[in-house]
Amino acid sequence: MKKIFSFLLVLTVVFSFSACGKKKDKAAENKVDLEYYAGLGQMPECDYKLGADPDEMVEKLTAAESSAEAAGDEYPFAVTEGEKTVRIDNGDFVYYYEKAKKDKGISYIIATNKGYGFEGGASILEIKNALPELEYTEEDVNDSNSFFLMGAIDGSVLKYTFKNRVISFFFSENELTAVTLYDTDNWT
């Protein structure tokens, strides 16, 4: 009986110590391979990627809108033609392409709620800490880098560049407001 009790006591101690030191790192929870997704030209949360055919997208989004309306649901979807670009907006994501480069497909994607695992409202430090091994540039939000934001905001942008793809995180009052992905070869 003493041997069994001793054996159980030893097992309890061994398992207790083996569980120590296994704290989850909060940064590891949000870790995503930006370089991999930049190479693919996509955001993991998004159904479409860079280079997608705009006509096919509009066709699919129009069908989704019709299905939602038939079911009595709302589906925000709009196509807006500008002088040089076309904007396709379905609520959570906004897609752009340049009219002169339509054959190259979608060249700019904007996530308004969540991008690369980061929810809207995440802090700039949270993203920097989750991606410590990647080089980035930090700049102020201005008209040229935030053309898609309605109205002027005072904030900053973290830019991660991988060859011809750029992933940017936009912050206003230290809260994530948008995440973008674009192709420098197909976007002016």
Describe each model-derived feature in a short phrase:
Residues A52-K101, I124-A178, T184-T188:
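A cross-family detector of function-defining hotspots
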